């Protein structure tokens, strides 16, 4: 044991403390028992096999350790603050996303109900010659009512699932926010203690040094990571309207608007990058989707649907271009003039983006065929995963100006030649009565 003789002599270790047993200066420190020793204590059997060093050396060693933990604590505090801010931002973001997906589901339901009603009317018109057969007419009406009811039930279920996933996500984020907030408070308190410890004199610093060190380390071992939440885009809207078959358009590519890097097939349905025409300048990590071409067909009214095979492309875009096209290879490239779905692969990871605004979507597996639906009157554009028969994303209440033209684009690679290609698919006869020349 050690004892203080005079408060005025606390900073002079040779006069600061004396051994109560031997009344000699305590100039040594036992790291095992965490006490100061005099020379006679050091020679005793009790400390014979313990790690003992000079008291100044011990203090400096602990001071360095405390300083290292202090630096680590400051770094960990910044990381915890960042996670806390991110979780708070994500809480606001998922609320907005939930509302957006709710509007998207409601918009898709309204569109499908309109198409269903139109299909019902067409079926009744085709049975006009059998109008006297009331049983047949009643059967058609009952069938339409049943389909409309099933459609409403499906979309109500989707809204309920969306709400359930949204609540689960919010609970996870709130729990994560609470953990991050608690860690920020703990680290702030620890940093204050460590700063005080590093500034203390030799004896004060060594007091309970090992305990303070271990407690500090245990706080730093607490791992913090952001909450894992369910992507709302997983709430797929299943099924494709049977009316899409009627609205299917047989599109062709317009050579006059094709980028010089593109080679078009003879039937003007397939586009691929020319060999040896890639622009190698610039950042090799940059994605340049300027290898663009418009469809020869344009739309000013009505509803239209087409499908694109993207299986042989690793970086592609499909969508709608609204505006005028200039000379060959110089179609307007302002992003604000296009509504796009973008697909890209990095290694084994596939990513989908929609624009505008730029938003990333969750993709469970590679997309092979994209369906595009356009309703000019209602300002709606929908993208579909044809293979999975599900909605990818839709835009509603778009303010279109002028003629609308389907747009297709491939990414110009920097370096090696890309084998990427896109093909416009055709299924059966087309109904192009509402297609403008």
Swiss-Prot record:
It comes from the Eukaryota. Keywords: Coiled coil, Metal-binding, Transferase, Ubl conjugation pathway, Zinc, Zinc-finger. Pfam families: PRY, SPRY, zf-B_box. One of its GO terms (biological process) is response to retinoic acid. The keyword DNA damage does not apply. Zn(2+) binds at residues 19, 22, 41, 47. Residues 55-200 form a coiled coil. It catalyses: S-ubiquitinyl-[E2 ubiquitin-conjugating enzyme]-L-cysteine + [acceptor protein]-L-lysine = [E2 ubiquitin-conjugating enzyme]-L-cysteine + N(6)-ubiquitinyl-[acceptor protein]-L-lysine. InterPro entries: B30.2/SPRY, B30.2/SPRY_sf, Butyrophylin_SPRY, ConA-like_dom_sf, PRY, SPRY_dom, TRIM/RBCC, Znf_B-box. GO terms for molecular function: identical protein binding; ubiquitin protein ligase activity; zinc ion binding. A zinc finger (B box-type) spans 14-55. GO terms for cellular component: cytoplasm. Residues 231-429 form the B30.2/SPRY domain. Its EC number is 2.3.2.27. Pathway: Protein modification; protein ubiquitination. CDD domains: SPRY_PRY_C-I_1. The keyword tRNA processing does not apply. This is Probable E3 ubiquitin-protein ligase TRIML2.
